[in-house]
A protein has these predicted regions:
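Generic N-terminal leader/processing signal
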Residues: 1-2, 277
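Core alpha/beta nucleotide-donor-binding catalytic domains of modification enzymes
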Residues: 2-41, 45-221
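ATP/NTP-dependent adenylation/nucleotidyl-transfer catalytic domains that generate, transfer
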Residues: 210-292
């Protein structure tokens, strides 16, 4: 079911949001003029905002836009309603639409994954396949600063290293981009409200069996109330610093990696143990991770 929010929004909201996203696109070289961008859209507020924001910026960059929606089939009728909403949105905006329905539960069972991870893998495979088959060279997703803060906290709780603590990458090697990464979720809601735009709500976002939802609804509010009202901004700042440093280190690891590779064919990759032993343990970890 779609929801329309109504608040008193400042007339500058749209311009400010577009300015932030435009700057993000340029800072991270997310798009080049004439790119074909496939937007992953669930129907929720973040992805709906992504569609309208990129559509507003498309003329400046000569972008060819399309929408991709995966029906996970996890919420029965609600999943079908989400698909219907996204279909209507694409028709209204006259954008090409690519839709698929997958059995995420079966994928989860066969690979012994959590539901959340199984859904993510199936969704990304669908996006990458749809982009490749239909001529789109970029895939845009609606992750924002709150998502990034949650990701950093999840990585911290898992005991991740610097790469995990670097959060959600604004740009991935497989051409996935996140134009909204410098915006708060509340800012996206303001943007939708200002333009009186509909979206759907996913009830699973309130299910506290998922760690991310616990972090969003319990841990972050506690951190904001008791320790740092701007903890989301602080976590994003830490992630940005680590992301930049990781990239710098990775660039310098590459020549060592190329020296260490002794076997590289479509099904196998081998590293020289003797060459690895010449490097400190931190470099060894990075080299092995790069090979994987």
């Amino acid at each position: 079911m779609s929801k329309k929010i109504s608040v008193s929004a400042n007339s500058d909201v749209k311009k400010r949001i577009l300015r932030v996203v435009d700057r993000t696109l340029q800072t991270h070289s997310m798009v080049q003029y004439g790119d074909a961008v496939l937007m992953g859209v669930s129907g929720g507020p973040d992805s709906v905002a992504l569609v309208h924001i990129l559509r507003a910026l498309a003329p400046k960059y000569g972008l060819k836009l399309a929408i991709a929606h995966l029906n996970h089939g996890l919420r029965q009728n609600a999943s079908d309603s989400d698909q219907a909403f996204v279909t209507t949105l694409a028709e209204k905006l006259q954008l090409p639409l690519y839709v698929d329905k997958q059995d995420v539960r079966l994928y989860q069972k066969n690979r012994h994954l959590s539901v959340e991870e199984a859904a993510r893998q199936v969704r990304y495979r669908f996006y990458l396949r749809s982009a490749s088959e239909n001529g789109y060279n970029k895939i845009a997703l609606g992750h924002h600063a709150d998502d990034n803060a949650e990701q950093v906290l999840m990585a911290m709780l898992r005991g991740s290293g610097p790469l995990g603590l670097a959060g959600i990458p604004p740009v991935r090697p497989d051409h996935i981009i996140r134009p909204l990464i410098n915006l708060r979720h509340s800012e996206l809601l303001d943007y939708l409200a200002y333009q009186n735009l509909d979206y759907v709500e996913d009830s699973s976002n309130r299910d506290l069996q998922f760690l991310r939802n616990k972090i969003r609804s319990r841990l972050i509010p506690e951190l904001q109330a008791e320790y740092n009202p701007k903890c989301v901004e602080s976590l994003n700042r830490t992630a940005a610093i680590l992301f930049a440093e990781e990239k710098w280190i990775d660039d310098r690891i590459l020549p060592i990696y190329e020296e260490a590779v002794v076997l590289d064919d479509p099904v196998r990759l081998g590293l020289s143990l003797d060459r690895l032993k010449q490097e400190p343990i931190a470099a060894q970890r990075r080299l092995i991770r790069k090979a994987l």
